[in-house]
Swiss-Prot record:
Function summary: Component of nuclear pore complex.
Gene: Nup88
N-acetylalanine carried by residues: 2
InterPro entries tied to this protein: Nucleoporin_Nup88, NUP88/NUP82
Record-listed Phosphothreonine modification sites: 526
Cellular component GO terms, alphabetical: nuclear envelope; nuclear pore; nucleoplasm
Coiled-coil region(s): 623-663
Subunit-level organization: Interacts with NUP214/CAN. Interacts with NUP62 and NUP98.
Species, as recorded: Mus musculus
Lineage start: Eukaryota, Metazoa, Chordata, Craniata, Vertebrata
Name of protein: Nuclear pore complex protein Nup88
Locations listed in the record: Nucleus, Nuclear pore complex
């Protein structure tokens, strides 16, 4: 290992010491040791006149990350240099500035590596070049720090050549694009797109024989004269340039021409140079796997005369449903297309209604178009020889953590693109057909934002210097991009966290429905919140990226010195961007904040007055409430006292009654009672005699009545006066008898008591 550059503090972050790590010194030495002709290529034509531009340089990506480690490909040593970004460092351990591991290839590749790609299972790394491909198997980890083979300085790694005989025998063929099959459950498979317009799928178990082959050329173009046929199709832009897999979906059995059931497969989107996109479905779940029929070209809406460009170079499928395709062109245009099911009225469906697969061809709806600033556009005269637009191939890269962000790398630098409208699109697609609010929110949503991270061609006379690679490191304070320049300088730039997903909730947290949510948080999450308003004001349409000082490690500063006029233009451009995109927007945000603060102060004063009034009302309310409660308590006590008083009175009556009952001398009332009782028998005898008299009179009258009613005797006819007299006499006698009976009953009851 190399010696340490300097001591490292315990509390320092990796962002501060990583650019000074010894691995970059080693890689820069490897660049200096290259052949002079190879090293002078990037420095050619650096004079101020700049008569011509060199051909496009290959865009490399020789960096990837795994966990807390950074892997850098050393082309000179055919090895990976592994740096731990968050490794433990205790006492007596060598400082991290000189500590790294070297993963050496046992069978090094014989071709130049342009890209390294980690497999979905994270056990293999694809070493991709234009003339071949190899798969490097990562060694095992063990030890307390979980390092490769316990932390050895150099570790041998086995490599698997992919399609070695094919590339050796076909010298005219080149590898255009390569990607891993996205399944983590199967054995690793890698997908290759070659210049003969054929996609081949290889398994690491049988790396020389393709498992599946997808021929993209038409039947009439497949002739014995392959070179002439390929040149003809390439001139028309009918060759595939890139592909990408989408998320796993369930595909109808008609696509695979099966009769039993539907198949679970990955959609494979294939981009042609003329801008057309084709679709097929790949399923390797069951051996030997299934390949769907090639569908397309997919119709694009709204239609464009130029089919959205004839210089397409890259395609990327964002991992969301519905799928969102990003199509890049060499002129710097990015098209964000939503993949939706085709309409029944589609012309293509009507023309191919005889084909059952035509019903399954989706459509691409171009949601927005974005133009990247590949090279800085400086204010210049009309007769500027560099007025023509700069163009170069663009590579699209997924963000390892954020599904709504992706990155673009090209010869002139690096861009980062974030899509803020994906969640609004999901809301709109998940809403009812009559729900227009979600559609209005989707149309009102701000477009994607573009960050110009790095510019390697700040001046027109500068030659492009494509980066060696980059990687996104997630952090608690936001994502950070690590860029490795062509001279192996390490640049660390933080990314905007606007589209960065929120941290998931902890397992120990439980939602409590009774706990009310903070009104400030509710206000901040509303679509019209002040925070989002300030963010919209501060949203920049342009930025000043990081500039590279030198484009080549072997070129002198005198050769690379730009003309003073272009330096002035560059400074003017940077000043204008700072003025318009930073200072002016910050002044506007400041005015809005001051206006908001004034309004909030007025609201605060009014709320304080209302608060004082509420406090007074609360005090009076509490006083009235206390009086009411006191009155209720007194009423309860009064009722209890009244009940106790009645109870005591009843007890006193009983006591007095028992007391009088035990006296030896009769009281006045008792004596009166005694006299009344003594008079009762006489009254009873008198009443008895009266009853006997009445009874005798009744019997007498009864006998008289019988005699009167007897038929032997003549009927006695009474006059009206006589009847009236008799009725009055009987009435008086009846009342007299009734009174006597009542008196007798009263006396009887009294005596019984």
């Amino acid at each position: 290992m190399a010696a340490a550059v300097g001591p490292l503090g315990d509390g320092e972050l990796w962002q501060s010491w990583l650019p000074n790590h010894v691995v970059f010194l080693r890689l820069r030495e490897g660049v200096r040791n290259q052949s002079p002709a190879e090293a002078e290529k990037p420095a050619a034509s650096t004079s101020p006149s700049c008569p011509s531009l060199p051909p496009h340089l290959p865009t490399r990506n020789l960096v990837f990350g795994l966990g807390g480690e950074l892997f850098l490909w050393d082309a000179e040593g055919s090895a990976f240099l592994v740096v731990r970004l968050r490794g433990p460092s205790g006492g007596g351990v060598e400082p991290p500035l000189s500590q790294y591991q070297r993963l050496l290839c046992i069978n090094p590749p014989l071709f130049e590596i342009h890209q390294v790609l980690l497999s979905p299972t994270q056990h293999h790394v694809a070493l991709i070049g234009s003339k071949g491909l190899m798969a490097l198997e990562l060694p095992q980890r063990w030890g307390k720090d979980s390092e490769f083979e316990g932390g050895k300085a150099t570790v041998n790694c086995s490599t698997i050549p992919i399609a070695e005989r094919f590339f050796t025998s076909s010298t005219s063929l080149t590898l255009k694009h390569a990607a891993w099959y996205p399944s983590e459950m199967l054995d690793p498979h890698i997908v290759l797109l070659t210049s003969d317009n054929v996609i081949r799928i290889y398994s690491l178990r049988e790396p020389q024989t393709p498992t599946k082959v997808i021929v993209l050329s038409e039947a009439e173009e497949e002739s014995l004269i392959l070179n002439k046929g390929r040149a003809y199709t390439a001139s028309l832009g009918e060759t595939a340039v890139a592909f990408d897999f989408g998320p796993l979906v369930t595909v109808s059995k008609n696509i695979f021409e099966q009769k039993d059931r539907d198949v679970v497969a990955y959609p494979l989107y294939i981009l042609y140079e003329n801008g057309e996109t084709f679709l097929t479905y790949v399923s390797l779940l069951h051996s030997p796997g299934n390949i769907g029929k090639l569908l397309g070209p997919l119709p694009m809406h709204p239609a464009a005369e130029d089919n959205y460009g004839y210089d397409a170079c890259a395609i990327l499928c964002l991992p969301c449903v519905p799928n969102i395709l990003v199509i890049a062109t060499e002129s710097g245009m990015l098209y964000h297309c939503v993949v939706l099911e085709g309409e029944e009225e589609d012309d293509q469906t009507l023309e191919k209604s005889w084909d059952p697969r035509a019903d399954f061809i989706p459509s691409l709806y171009v949601f927005e178009c974005v133009e990247l600033e590949l090279a800085l556009k400086l204010a210049s005269g009309e007769d500027d020889p560099f007025a023509s637009d700069f163009s170069c191939p663009i590579k699209l890269h997924r963000d390892p953590k954020c599904p709504s962000r992706y990155h673009c790398s090209h010869e002139a630098g690096v861009h980062s693109v974030g899509l803020t409208w994906i969640h609004k699109l999901h809301k709109f697609l998940g809403s009812d057909e009559e729900d227009k609010d979600s559609l209005q929110e989707l149309t009102a949503e701000q477009k994607c934002f573009v960050e110009h991270i790095l510019c390697t061609k700040p001046l027109p006379c500068r030659q492009p210097a494509p980066i060696r690679g980059f990687w996104i490191v997630p952090d608690i304070l936001g994502p950070t991009m690590i860029c490795i320049t062509s001279t192996y300088e390490c640049l660390i730039r933080p990314l905007l966290s606007t589209v960065h997903p929120a941290s998931p909730p902890l397992l120990c947290t439980q939602e409590d429905a009774e706990v009310a949510e903070s009104p400030l948080r509710i206000l901040a999450e509303t679509p019209d919140s002040f925070e989002k308003h300030i963010k919209r004001i501060l949203q920049r349409s342009a930025a000043n990226p990081a500039f590279l000082k030198n484009c080549s490690a072997r070129s002198s500063e005198k050769d690379l010195a730009p003309p003073p006029e272009e330096c002035l233009q560059l400074i003017s451009r940077a000043t204008q961007v700072f003025r318009e995109q930073y200072i002016l927007k910050q002044d506007l945000a400041k005015e809005e904040i001051q206006r908001r603060v004034k309004l909030l102060c007025d609201q605060k004063r009014k709320q304080l007055e209302d608060l004082n009034y509420c406090r007074e009302e609360r005090v009076s309310h509490l006083f009235r409430k206390s009086l009411r409660e006191m009155a209720e308590r007194l009423a309860d006590k009064y009722e209890e006292a009244k009940e106790k008083q009645e109870d005591i009175m009843n007890r006193m009556k009983k006591v007095l009654h028992s007391f009088h009952a035990q006296l030896p001398v009769l009281s006045d009332s008792e004596r009166d009672m005694k006299k009344e009782l003594q008079l009762i028998p006489d009254q009873l005898r008198h009443l008895g005699n009266a009853i006997k008299q009445v009874t005798m009179k009744k019997d007498y009258q009864q006998r008289k009545m019988e005699k009167v009613l007897s038929p032997q005797k003549p009927t006695i006819t009474l006059s009206a006066y006589q009847r009236k007299c008799i009725q009055s006499i009987l009435k008086e006698e009846g009342e007299h008898i009734r009174e006597m009976v009542k008196q007798i009953n009263d006396i009887r009851n009294h005596v019984t008591f």
